[in-house]
Amino acid sequence: MVAPLAVDIDGTLTRPDKSIDPRVFDAIRAWDDHVVIATGKSFPYPVGLCEFLGMPLNVIAENGGAVYVEPAGEVVYNGDPEGAAAVAEEYVAAGYDLGWGAVDMVNRWRETELAVDRDQPLEPLVAIADDHGMDVVDTGYAYHVKDAGVDKATGLETVAELLGVVPSSFIAIGDSENDAELLELAGTGFAVANADAHARGAADAVTDASFADGFLEALDRARDNR
């Protein structure tokens, strides 16, 4: 079965050392339908990946907070960037740190949410986020502070509308808590074997292989309809 594909980056297209497995490049390019890169990373990362793959710029960034579909030619923003900024300001004012050093390259281009290093205290971050009506999601790579009503499924709904398809037509592949809603909304959701409990619980199937090997396995299983 070939259908539109939505795929996460970290933990799904990568190896355990967090580098992208180059085998996924040709696999994505060969997929004979729409491919959407759906990530918690800020907008330049999925856009850059699409550019270097030579594929249409169909991206869900910042956990659904920023969406771009090339045929539509516009960026759609979901979420509350002012809320994320307020959480950052209050967290730092309380004596905590975002954890990315003097030059914060992680949040530099982030427009609708905030990412905090997982070595930083979580409890005060959650408390401050709650005060501002924001959620904190642990992706296994960072704590993401985002609008409570926005996630990758929100992004997929936007993408599907712009592409003229329905969300249930998609195959989705991911590994983390922030992929759970995406995996549930898609017609078929695969969690790779290294996925956390949230992603596993939301998926229709879990691959035997982990990381990029699991992604490649999921593509094979989707083609074979198994």
Swiss-Prot record:
Single GO MF annotation: phosphoglycolate phosphatase activity
SUPFAM superfamilies listed in its UniProt record: HAD-like
Pfam families linked: Hydrolase_3
Example of a GO cellular component annotation carried by this entry: cytosol
Enzyme class: hydrolase
Cross-referenced InterPro entries: HAD-like_sf, HAD-SF_hydro_IIB, HAD_sf, PGPase
Active site: D8
Residues given in the record as substrate binding sites: K152
NCBIfam families according to UniProt: HAD-SF-IIB (TIGR01484), Pglycolate_arch (TIGR01487)
Function: Catalyzes the dephosphorylation of 2-phosphoglycolate.
Family: Belongs to the archaeal SPP-like hydrolase family.
Protein name stated in the entry: Phosphoglycolate phosphatase
